[in-house]
Amino acid sequence: MSSARGPRRPTIVDVAQRAGVSKSLVSLVMHDSPRVAPGSRDAVLRAARELGYRPNAVARSLVRQRSGVLGCILSDLHNPYFADVADGIEEAASQGGYRALLSAGFLDPAREGAAVETLLELQVDGLIMLGSMLELDAIAEWAGQIPVVVIGHASASDVMDSVTDDDEAGATAAVDHLVALGHRRIAHIHGGAVVSARARRRGYERSMAAHGLAANVRSVPGAYTEDGGASAMRVILETTDIPTAVFVANDLAALGALDALDHAGVQVPAELSLVGYDDIVTAQSPRVALTTVA
């Protein structure tokens, strides 16, 4: 049985022969050496384009001891908030002379860990973890190998940096707002095991207690997804004591909750007030008009 093979990839030797120069000169050009005359550089680059030659990124990283690539793990590609942050990461990386290589964790700690290992095998120069489902102790092991920044985790670790807002305070502000509107029966759709979701749940409970509403605390299991928000809202609507307001752990889940309310014929905010979190672009649409914590 014969097996078909793709066309042979051009090598640095092929480029040297096409340009009529030495292999070492081609190597200097590919490593952006300032010791190459402009005419020779142009000839090498032209030959490389004609042949479709691309330098081996792994080999270059071994020589330079850096890849020029930052690995970025997003826990959920479907979350617009994460997409907005990833866009900013890509722009900042580009300005710093780096490329960002994105990978997804799919809200699954095991898959997220596997994605990190793959990025480490690709010799990325640093790792940015957005909305990680992993505990900080696990992340700290990788931080001992390369620089790591976690977004959404508050870390006091000496081996990694963290970027986060005060999720607990934001959730407290959301409940304070609803109480100021006159609501007393305020439920919460929480976001599951994500670190930020746990902090937002604490903020909800703290604010309810501060307003003397601890007996009214009602936290319904959900997730940082539209399906998670919709299913949790359906659970709420099936009860006999329906709250007058619901604080949802993030905007994506709040959109799902809005959809469930719409299907049930419940008008927002006339019959039930809803507050989300993250201030994603969709929440700003006039057709949605979702109150959210920025």
Q: Which residues does each PLM region occupy?
A:
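Alpha-helical recognition/docking segments in bacterial nutrient-uptake
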Residues: 1-10, 65-176, 180, 238
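N-terminal helix-turn-helix DNA-binding module of bacterial transcription factors
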Residues: 1-66
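Short gly/ser/thr-rich secondary-structure transition/capping motifs
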Residues: 50-56, 109-110, 129-132, 258
